[in-house]
């Protein structure tokens, strides 16, 4: 976790131009990973209380706490024993980042300090041309970032920031959006700032025809074109999944930073950035969850077009419904245990949730490679036409991450909702199911 004095780094790491790959060789990552295994999990409460002042101006209560922080920032060093001077915070960060600029990040942000050691009210990043207002302890103030000009800073941190001239125009999409006094642990502040890629995506999407759906593939191509232009070395090129979605984890290879994004828009999720390791991301996080119902509508299932796909989905839901009814009716069946059903769910929705819980042995929220095997056997045994079985699991895996979520399973089986009602139609009643007489449905015809 980055020290609080360096709360600019995640924002500015993405503003930096890519540096040669050899800066972060396999040996570098290996060394950092080994350090993490050894130091990052240290339990420090029982360590002797001997304060240390670090090179970034931060005071650590023990050597153990310092080592735990150093595993996240290998360049961190001990400046001297004892507490750091409060007024030297900005000065220490300035000295520290200047050293970083010489060693590793040539375009790292270097703060400006007042004579008393506090942060200057206006801070600028010379390479990108952006300036913004900060509080006396260096935190950015929301809505103050401007390009190639001096921002109008509020008289106090509680004063409402005046909106800058031209706000709301198209060129605002390129300005970094900074947090207003983030709450919580100061050490977590570093992970809350959007990356330059946020603004690149926003800017490119604004240029996309409003009548056409933007996709990661389009953004990827646009970024490649931008990267070819002069002085565009800082362009971040997104990684794409199947179907025009973004991969849930995006990284800036030259700096080692990674963060989670919304898979449908590519927007970074605040509080998720990490360095030298991949964050744990939600593979289904979306800005517009309601649109997920349309993802499978025109998605082709190889070897199973049109009416055949509809017949196949109906046979799968019929078989699953029958299995659930039999399992619930059999007192000796452990698979028949159902949690309290949602009264708004239709039979098909209950069936999918029941079967998903049955497959998700480790309760991880997705069905992995090993957990999916019973589903494949079920499809081969109880569904028809058989030609539709071969590629069905891949068809369900919308983001191509080798696992299936309950939303993906519902979507690929055609069990979706529209305007608060399940988008299903009347179908065959499973034997032995009294409840289904009032809930007989058929999946939406796809393809």
Swiss-Prot record:
Annotated GO biological process: extracellular matrix organization; positive regulation of cell-substrate adhesion
InterPro entries with a match to the protein in the record: Dev_reg/Prot_inhib (IPR051950), EF-hand-dom_pair (IPR011992), EF_Hand_1_Ca_BS (IPR018247), EF_hand_dom (IPR002048), Kazal_dom (IPR002350), SMOC2_EC (IPR037640), SPARC/Testican_Ca-bd-dom (IPR019577), Thyroglobulin_1 (IPR000716)
Compositional bias per record (Polar residues), positions renumbered to this chain: 206-216
Binding site for Ca(2+) 1: 360, 362, 364, 366, 371
Keyword Lyase recorded: no
Keyword field: Basement membrane, Calcium, Disulfide bond, Extracellular matrix, Glycoprotein, Metal-binding, Repeat, Secreted, Signal
GTP-binding listed as a keyword: no
GO molecular function: calcium ion binding; glycosaminoglycan binding; heparin binding
Binding site for Ca(2+) 2: 397, 399, 401, 403, 408
Tissue: Strongly expressed in ovary, followed by heart, muscle, spleen, brain, thymus, lung, liver, kidney, spleen, testis, ovary and skeletal muscle.
Residues the record marks as carrying a glycan: 206, 362
A single cellular component GO annotation: interstitial matrix
Listed name of the protein: SPARC-related modular calcium-binding protein 2
Organism: Mus musculus (Mouse)
């Amino acid at each position: 976790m980055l020290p609080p004095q360096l709360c600019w780094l995640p924002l500015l790491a993405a503003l930096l131009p890519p540096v040669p790959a050899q800066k972060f060789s396999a040996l570098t990552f290996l060394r950092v990973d080994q350090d993490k295994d050894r130091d990052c999990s240290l339990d420090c409460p029982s360590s002797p209380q001997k304060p240390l002042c670090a090179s970034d101006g931060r005071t650590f209560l023990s050597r153990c706490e310092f080592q735990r922080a150093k595993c996240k920032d290998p360049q961190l060093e001990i400046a001297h024993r004892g507490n750091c001077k409060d007024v030297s915070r900005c000065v220490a960060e300035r000295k520290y980042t200047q050293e970083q600029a010489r060693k590793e990040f040539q375009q790292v942000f270097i703060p400006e300090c007042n004579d008393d050691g506090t942060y200057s009210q206006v801070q600028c990043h010379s390479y990108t041309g952006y300036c913004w207002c900060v509080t006396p302890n260096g935190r950015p103030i929301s809505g103050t970032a401007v390009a190639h000009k001096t921002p109008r800073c509020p008289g106090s941190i509680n004063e409402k920031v005046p909106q800058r001239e031209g706000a709301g125009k198209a060129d605002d999409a390129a300005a970094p959006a900074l947090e207003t006094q983030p709450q919580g642990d100061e050490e977590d502040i570093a992970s809350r700032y959007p990356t330059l890629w946020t603004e690149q995506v926003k800017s490119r999407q604004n240029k996309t025809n409003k009548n056409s759906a933007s996709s990661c593939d389009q953004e990827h191509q646009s970024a490649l074109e931008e990267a070819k232009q002069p002085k565009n070395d800082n362009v971040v090129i997104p990684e794409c999944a199947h179907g025009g979605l973004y991969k849930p984890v995006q990284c800036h290879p030259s700096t080692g930073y990674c963060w989670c994004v919304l898979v449908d828009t590519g927007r970074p999720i605040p509080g998720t950035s990490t360095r030298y390791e991949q964050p744990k991301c939600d593979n289904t996080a979306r800005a517009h969850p309601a649109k997920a119902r349309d993802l499978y509508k025109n998605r082709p299932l190889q070897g199973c077009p049109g009416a055949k796909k509809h017949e196949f989905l109906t046979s799968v839901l019929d078989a699953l419904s029958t299995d659930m009814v039999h399992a619930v009716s059999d007192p000796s069946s452990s698979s028949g245990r159902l949690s309290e059903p949602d009264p708004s769910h239709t039979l098909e929705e209950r069936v999918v949730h029941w079967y998903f819980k049955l497959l998700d042995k480790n309760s991880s929220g997705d069905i992995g490679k090993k957990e999916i095997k019973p589903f494949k056997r079920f499809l081969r045994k109880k569904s028809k036409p058989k030609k539709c079985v071969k590629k069905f699991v891949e068809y369900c895996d919308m983001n191509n991450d080798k696992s299936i979520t309950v939303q993906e399973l519902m979507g690929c089986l055609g069990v979706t909702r529209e305007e608060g009602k399940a988008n299903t139609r009347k179908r065959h009643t499973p034997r032995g199911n009294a409840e289904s007489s009032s809930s007989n449905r058929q999946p939406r015809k796809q393809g």
